[in-house]
Amino acid sequence: MLTWLNRNSLDFPPLEKALREPNGLLAAGGDLSADRLISAYRHGCFPWFQDGQPILWWSPDPRTVLFPEELHISRSLAKVLRQSRYRVTFDQDFASVIKACAAPRSYANETWITGSMQAAYVELHRRGHAHSVEVWDQDELVGGLYGLAMGQLFFGESMFSRADNASKVGFATLVEHLTAWGFVLIDCQMPTQHLHSFGARSIPRQTFADYLSRHLDQPTDADWSARRV
C-alpha cells in the first residue's frame, strides 16, 4: 500500500516499503520544501512526477550509480576533451541550467521538472546543497547538468545539451573533479544507455542505502565556488 506523507513530518517510510510495480514508488504527497528534499535524499529517495500528479517519491531497486573511478571515456569524447572546444564552469548560472533541463525534449511533450521543482532546487542551490555544471561555447550556454552534493555522494538530477557532446564534456569534467575531491559515488537514479556508456551500473537498493549510511556525513575537499574549471 502506498504511503501518503504527513505535511507536518519530514519522515519517509522504510525503503523496503517501496512498491515493486511501478518499481520503487515509495510515497506520495508532502511538499517540495528544502528541508523535505534534503530529508528525502538522505533517506535514499527522490521526487519525480508530472504536472497534475501528486508529488511522488521514488527509491528504485536496483539503483543506477557511477563509481567515479570507473568512469569510461570513449575515444571520441577524449578527442573532444583534448580539443578544449568548450569552457566548463561550476555554479555560475544554476537557474539557467535547470530551466534548460526542464525544456521538453524532442521525444516528449512534457517535463517532470515543473515550475515548483525548479523553484525548490534553486532554493537548495541558495542553501549550498545543489550545484550546477555549465558548458559554454564562447558566451553561449550549450550544455550542463545539476545535482546535489551531500557528504561524499553526488546525486545527479538532469542534464541538457544544445551542441554536440556538450553535456558529455560537462559530466566528464564533473566526475574528474568529484574524484579529486574524494567523492565515492554518483547517484544516477535510473538506468539509461547514455549513463551506461560512462560506466554507470546498477546495484541493489540495500547496497545503495549502505553507502548513504557510511558516506553522507563524511567530509570532502569540494570547492564549488563559481569559476572556470
From Swiss-Prot:
GO molecular function: leucyl-tRNA--protein transferase activity
GO cellular component: cytoplasm
UniProt xrefs under InterPro entries: Acyl_CoA_acyltransferase, Leu/Phe-tRNA_Trfase, Leu/Phe-tRNA_Trfase_C, Leu/Phe-tRNA_Trfase_N
Coiled coil: none
GO biological process, one term: protein catabolic process
UniProt keyword annotations, A-Z: Acyltransferase, Cytoplasm, Transferase
Main location as per UniProt: cytoplasm
E.C. number(s) listed in UniProt: 2.3.2.6
Cell compartments where the protein resides: Cytoplasm
Catalytic reactions of this protein: N-terminal L-lysyl-[protein] + L-leucyl-tRNA(Leu) = N-terminal L-leucyl-L-lysyl-[protein] + tRNA(Leu) + H(+); N-terminal L-arginyl-[protein] + L-leucyl-tRNA(Leu) = N-terminal L-leucyl-L-arginyl-[protein] + tRNA(Leu) + H(+); L-phenylalanyl-tRNA(Phe) + an N-terminal L-alpha-aminoacyl-[protein] = an N-terminal L-phenylalanyl-L-alpha-aminoacyl-[protein] + tRNA(Phe)
A Pfam family per the record: Leu_Phe_trans
Enzyme class, broadest EC rank: transferase
Family: Belongs to the L/F-transferase family.
Function as written in the Swiss-Prot or TrEMBL entry: Functions in the N-end rule pathway of protein degradation where it conjugates Leu, Phe and, less efficiently, Met from aminoacyl-tRNAs to the N-termini of proteins containing an N-terminal arginine or lysine.
NCBIfam families in the record: aat (TIGR00667)
HAMAP family linked: Leu_Phe_trans
Name the UniProt record assigns to this protein: Leucyl/phenylalanyl-tRNA--protein transferase
Annotated organism of origin: Pseudomonas syringae pv. syringae (strain B728a)
